[in-house]
Amino acid sequence: MSPEKAVLDIQGQFRVYTEFYHTDAAAKTIILVNGSLATTASFAQTVRNLYPTFNVVLYDQPYSGRSKPHNVHGAPLTREEEGQLLLELIDHFNAEHVLSFSWGGAATLVALAHQPRRIESAVISSFSPVINGPMREYLDKGLDYLGAHSRYDMGHLINNTIGKHLPSLFKRVNYRHVSSLDGHEYDQMHYHFSQVLELDPDNYLTAGKRIKVPVLFINGAWDEYTSANDAAQFSRYLQNCSFNTIEATGHFLDMEHKAACRDSKQALMNFLQPAHTSSSVYNRVQGHHAFAF
């Protein structure tokens, strides 16, 4: 299962590393949008859940992963810029579906509000329009650690909060990833955190009024940071949305344990292919994974 790899020029502004898992047997293509400072490796298990039923597209943001060496790192990217970049990739790969994780939901909502012609449906996982108490505490501490480029503290903060339900192996890999980031990546993450804290939640919700395609929101029952109850507020504004809560699971969903992987896959397939039935087998993914929010 080897993807086609490429570095794409996006309107002369950015160069973006992509991986395209393609098979002639798949009729539809889905593009995956990762969380803040996560990389294509973060979606290793999700790719296994979706491919070869779908063609799957992964990409690294210009400031991270394998896109990083191909770009000049000046001002942080805004969620609007990330949304526009996603629209360009949707057009390039002729994608019919989008699946986002965590902060990737912000860029995905921006893109969907532009009503891209090809998109038929979207899945937004581990995302909420509400900054509740636990999330605010996490963001406030994160701002301090990121501003000081305190790698040790930031790595432990993520593992002790949104990542607390991850297996110990993934926590170790997560810590190594977060603690080895470049300074501009910490600055980008600091900007993300600031944006989340300063943004009026109605901004997300109002944008939802312009989204016409079906959207599924998936949250973990144990995720107190982007909770299922908070995500349900999207129902006030989106014309066609549904919700699925993965039991006994936190923020990282299919990465956390076998049952979460099985239930996450089933939720995806029931939504993307309502008639689809499958028996899922959890595959512990070996190698390097980057899981940062």
Segments the model singles out, each with a brief description of its role:
Residues 249-262:
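Catalytic histidine-centered segment of alpha/beta-hydrolase-like enzymes
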Residues 211, 217-219:
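Short beta-strand/loop motif that positions the catalytic acidic residue
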Residues 133-135, 153-208:
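Conserved alpha/beta-hydrolase catalytic His-Asp/Glu region
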Residues 58-99, 263:
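Active-site loop/oxyanion-hole signature of alpha/beta-hydrolase fold enzymes
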